[in-house]
Amino acid sequence: MSKKSQDLTETQVSSRNVFDGELLHVYQDKARLPDGKVKVREYITHPGAVVIIPLLDNGELILERQHRYPLHRDFYELPAGKIDQNEDPLSCAKRELLEETGYVADSWRYLATLHPCIGYSNEKLIYYLATGLAFREANLDDGEHLEVFTLPLITALEWVNAGKITDNKSVSGLFWAEKVLNSNW
């Protein structure tokens, strides 16, 4: 970039809360664009979530099968969960791993923060690699039903390629895991 970067900032003119749900909040704002025009911007606020890549000593990953109501089908996923208000993301990751899978980890490594839907949400996903796993006991949240199983990373990646794993957060996490475990990152 040899030229000076253009200011692309959009400035909020007004904001209207359209919907307040238990998890999501929808807003419709008017924003002033860099050229001075005012346009409507609609977006969803989300508290953020953690995604855990739990790696067993034998090299297999812990995954979950869970029904997702919006798409009316089961999905294969990495363990994950919503960050509670004022909760530290690593504390959330530890809590979610234990609640959903029954495992605790001796070692935690931050991998990345990704924004899965930047065009309409402020949601962020914070990824951790969990190793040194030991089983305790799962304690699912009320209304949460899932099946926990293990799978080699190579098989999980084959499932991605075959379209059997399509969940965005899990696909991203599996690709991160492959890079990290192959010492490429």
Put a short name on every predicted segment:
Residues 10, 14-51, 57:
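Acidic, metal-coordinating catalytic segment for phosphate/diphosphate chemistry
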